[in-house]
A protein has these predicted regions:
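Intrinsically disordered terminal and processing segments
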Residues: 1-40, 46-47, 58-65, 73-101
């Protein structure tokens, strides 16, 4: 069975503050430990060692490439720009709030 992913985004005042990419969590899954594979990224692991999600704590400095390096290392399919588009929003004044590259 393929893992289903979903993206949750926290924003305030027109700015994206954080994101969480969930990897097909099972009922009752909770984070038992974390790792920090790079700046602005935190991987959550279930008690059995499975990666269950990726916290994007600094979307303004994290790139799609950096996220995909972590996903591939976790044996997850790379994300597309469309999948993560809510993280990389352009505000009304033209200021980029995230960096897709």
């Amino acid at each position: 069975m393929a893992n289903r992913r979903s993206l949750e985004v926290s924003a305030a005042g027109g700015r994206v503050l954080a994101g969480y990419l969930t990897f097909g969590r099972r009922p009752g899954d909770s984070s038992a430990r974390t790792s920090r594979p790079g700046p602005g990224l935190v991987v959550d692991y279930a008690p059995d060692g499975r990666a269950i999600g990726l916290e994007i704590t600094a979307p303004s400095v994290v790139t799609l490439h950096a996220i995909n390096e972590v996903l591939v290392a976790l044996e997850q399919a790379p994300a597309t720009a469309d999948e993560l588009a809510p993280l990389f929003v352009v505000r009304g004044g033209g200021a980029v709030v995230g960096t897709p590259g």
